[in-house]
Every structure is written in structure tokens, then in C-alpha cells.
Amino acid sequence: MTTGQRTGTTFGSLHAFFPGVLAMGGDVERARRLQESAFRMWTLHGIEPEALDYRKMTVTRAGYQLRPEIVESAYILSHYTTDPKYVEMGRRMFSDLVKHCRTEAGYTVLKSVITKEKGDFQHSFLLAETLKYFYLLFKPEALDFDKVTFNTEAHPLRRTW
């Protein structure tokens, strides 16, 4: 970590929160580039795999777990940049989620983003986080971003400082 040497070439869906962190820390240009990379991971198979070897551009963990991180980063970048491409990114991701994960009774994980084979499970964070970030991305006036902070489960807490 302190040498700057690359120790791996895997990027996963759980790492996709980091563009938002970079943007909130003021490094918007790096955040933009990393979000573009995360979105390329999404578009490679039409939905985000759990992990990808970005050197080989091959999926190393093919499941899709309905995670919020990439949508959260799009929302944060949309706020800080007002660039409409993040809303468009969100529209594509939402459309893909509905297309591939919708069931008669809700949504489900995918066993494989390559084959689009559906699982039989819906994580609670789909409702608590993923869909909430989509809503906020598409309707930013619903919440004053600068007057709240989000806890780890995407619950907005009013800032008093």
C-alpha cells in the first residue's frame, strides 16, 4: 500500500462507492474517471458483476447482488458536477436492473450477469439503499444534499453542524 506498486487488478461492485468519496473530498476529476470505469464494468454485460479483472476485462465473480454503491456515486457526482451524464448513467442502470432482475413479486439477484440466470433472493438493501439512491438521482430536489449526511444504510440524517 505504501509503495505504489499494484498488488491486484480486481475491481468489484463494493468498490464502486469510492468515486462518491473522492467527489466529497474535492477530487472530482479522479472521481469522474473512476465512475466511468465502474460504469464500463456495468455495461460490459449489461449489468454489474460482483468483480472484474480490469486488466483482462473478464468477470471473476459473475453474480449481481442489487448493490447500491455505483448508484450512490452517480448521485453524489450528479450533485457536485450537475453533469446530466450521471442521471443518464442512472437511467441506464435502472433500466438494466428492471430488465434483468424484475420478477412477479419484486426483484432478485442474478446468479450470473453473463447468462442473466436469476436467483431467488432480494436483499433488503435494494429497497433501503439502491432504489433510494435512484430516486434521489432522478429527483434531487427531494432532499437537500448539503443539509444531510447519509449513514451506511443510506438513511439521511439532518446535519446540525
Residue spans of the language-model regions?
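Glycan-recognition and catalytic cores of secretory/periplasmic carbohydrate-active enzymes
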Residues: 1-161
